Amino acid sequence: MRIAFLGTPDFAVTCLAELVASGHEIVCVYSQPPAPRGRGQDLKPSPVHAFAEGLGLPVRTPVSMKTPEEIAAFQALDLDAAVVVAFGQILVKDVLEAPKHGCFNLHASLLPRWRGAAPIQRAIMAGDAVTGVQVMRMSEGLDEGPILMSQQVAIADDDTAASLHDKLAAVGARLLPVALAAIEREVVQETPQAEDGVTYAKKIKSAEARIDWTRPAAEIDRHIRGLSPFPGAWFEAPSEKGPVRVKALLSRVEAASGVAGTTLDDALLIACGEGSIRLLKAQREGKGVQDAQTFTRGFPIATGTVLA
C-alpha cells in the first residue's frame, strides 16, 4: 500500500523501520520541525526525521497540519493509508479522510485508559499492572476512535518509562504490519471504545515531576520510575551555593523510617511518609547520570539533611 508515516520520537522509529521492512511504499514521512536539543541548543531533526532521511525517504516537517497548503499537499499524495505514531499534532477532518482506507494510530495504552500524550509514564505512576498497544482508526476526538487490534504488555515492578517504552515499541512495531495487512484486505473488525474507564494521560510538567517526600515510599518509587529518564523526578538538596536540583532516576523501596524528606544515611537513603527510598542513580544540574556512590563522592549529602 501507499502509506504516509507521521511520527516524531524514538518510539515511532521502531515502527517506521518495521513498516519499511514489511514492503509497503512509504510515500512520505511527516515529523515535528527540528527543535533545540543538547547543551548547545542547536536545532536538530527529530529521531523519525533523521531515520527517514537516512533511508532516503521524503520528509515534511510542517509547523501545523491544519493550513490549507499542508492539507492540499497531504491530499495530493494519493494514499491508501496513513500511520500515526506519537506525531504530536492534531489532524483535522480533511487530513483524516484523505487516504483511501483512512488514518490509523498506534497508541501505547489499553484505551480508553490513558488517552493523551504520556500514557507510558502515567501507567507506571498509577501502579497499573498491565498496559499495552492498540491500533485504532483515528477520529477527530483525542484517541477516541474504534480499536482494530490490541496486545497487552505486563508492567514489571522494576520497569521505568524507558524500559516499558522499549517493550511497547517492539510489540507495536510487530502489530502494525499485521493490522495494515487486514486493512488492505478489508477484513479488519473495528470495536468501539468502552464509555467507562476513560482516563487522560496529560503531559508531565516540571512542577508535577517534583518529589513529594510525604508520600509513601512505594508511590514515590513509581513516580521516579515513571519519569525516568525523562523528564525526571526531582528534588532540591542544600549546598553552600544554594539549592541544587537533583533528578532521581532509579530507586529501591526500603523499610527504614524517619522524618519525611530527611536523609537517613550518607548514601542517599531518604525517609518518606511511609518507609524510605534508596536512590541508586541520580543526576544533578550540569552533570551526567551517576550511580549513588559516584554521586555522593562528588556531591556529599550528610545524614540528617532535609531535602525539598
Curated annotation (Swiss-Prot):
It is an enzyme of class 2 (transferase). Keywords: Protein biosynthesis, Transferase. Its EC number is 2.1.2.9. GO terms for molecular function: methionyl-tRNA formyltransferase activity. It holds the Pfam family Formyl_trans_C. It catalyses: L-methionyl-tRNA(fMet) + (6R)-10-formyltetrahydrofolate = N-formyl-L-methionyl-tRNA(fMet) + (6S)-5,6,7,8-tetrahydrofolate + H(+). The keyword Lipid metabolism does not apply. InterPro entries: Fmt, Formyl_trans_C, Formyl_transf_N, Formyl_transf_N_sf, Formyl_transferase-like_C_sf, Met-tRNA-FMT_C, Met-tRNA-FMT_N. (6S)-5,6,7,8-tetrahydrofolate binds at residues 109-112. Transmembrane segments: none annotated. SUPFAM superfamilies: FMT C-terminal domain-like, Formyltransferase. GO terms for cellular component: cytosol. Belongs to the Fmt family. Attaches a formyl group to the free amino group of methionyl-tRNA(fMet). The formyl group appears to play a dual role in the initiator identity of N-formylmethionyl-tRNA by promoting its recognition by IF2 and preventing the misappropriation of this tRNA by the elongation apparatus. This is Methionyl-tRNA formyltransferase. The lineage of its organism: Bacteria, Pseudomonadati, Pseudomonadota, Alphaproteobacteria, Caulobacterales. The gene is fmt.
